[in-house]
């Protein structure tokens, strides 16, 4: 959903397409899938006022082979791949990630829905650093996302946001770099 915020979305218009993946039949996997469906489909989506009208499931996520006369098997962990989409009344209010250095006294602001927890489990960075596990990013309070959508829409309407980029695909440094590339500018960050 944060990827969509560059556009003037309204949460009730947001829909999700969900691909639920699990190695059903493996110990604990059916229960883990149920907990995932419950958390997303029965708790988070209703709290946000959004729905999942489309999707698919892949419930045999395992591989099995024979090696040296022994059967080996690797089940995939429960995974959920989500795409979000929304209809817009007018696309002209959509922001780009392009930083603009022609204006004086602008500030690049990080809004941290993770509340300083820096959860990186499963990220590419964690994998590169050999720390693939750990706590994964999560939305602790649905109201935080609702408030963010509301605030961004108000600030956009008031002309107070010049550019937008979420940090879900690589974190703060990747977002800042992509914004600088888009604007053909350099950037100096002071992270307090």
What residue ranges belong to the model's regions?
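Long, low-charge, small-residue-enriched segments that form tightly packed helices used
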Residues: 139-143
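Glycine-rich anion-binding loops of enzyme active sites
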Residues: 15-116
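Alpha-helical support elements that line or immediately flank enzyme active sites
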Residues: 1-5
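Glycine-rich phosphate/pyrophosphate-binding loops
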Residues: 7-16
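Gly-rich Lys/Arg/Thr-decorated short loops/hinges at beta-loop-alpha junctions or inter-strand turns
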Residues: 79, 120-138
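Short, well-ordered loop/turn and helix-capping segments at boundaries between secondary-structure elements
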Residues: 6, 87, 111-114, 178-185
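Short, solvent-exposed amphipathic alpha-helical segments in soluble enzyme
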Residues: 97-102, 125-128, 176-182
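Glycine-/charge-enriched secondary-structure boundary and capping motifs
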Residues: 30, 39-40, 44, 48, ...
């Amino acid at each position: 959903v944060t990827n969509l915020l560059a556009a003037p979305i309204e949460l009730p218009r947001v829909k999700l397409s969900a691909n639920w993946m699990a190695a059903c039949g493996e110990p604990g996997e059916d229960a883990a899938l149920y907990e995932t469906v419950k958390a997303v489909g029965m708790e988070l989506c209703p709290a946000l006022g959004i729905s999942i009208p489309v999707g698919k499931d892949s419930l045999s996520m395992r591989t099995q082979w024979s090696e040296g006369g022994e059967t080996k098997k690797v089940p995939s962990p429960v995974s959920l791949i989500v795409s979000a989409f929304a209809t817009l009344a007018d696309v002209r209010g959509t922001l780009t990630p392009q930083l603009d250095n022609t204006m004086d006294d602008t500030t690049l602001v990080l809004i941290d829905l993770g509340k300083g927890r820096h959860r990186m489990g499963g990220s590419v960075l964690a994998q590169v650093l050999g720390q693939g596990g750990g706590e994964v990013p999560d939305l602790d309070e649905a109201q935080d996302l609702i408030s963010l959508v509301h605030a961004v829409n108000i600030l956009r309407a008031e002309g107070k946001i010049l550019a937008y980029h979420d940090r879900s695909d690589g974190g703060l440094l990747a977002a800042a770099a992509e914004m600088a590339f888009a604007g053909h500018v350099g950037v100096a960050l002071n992270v307090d």
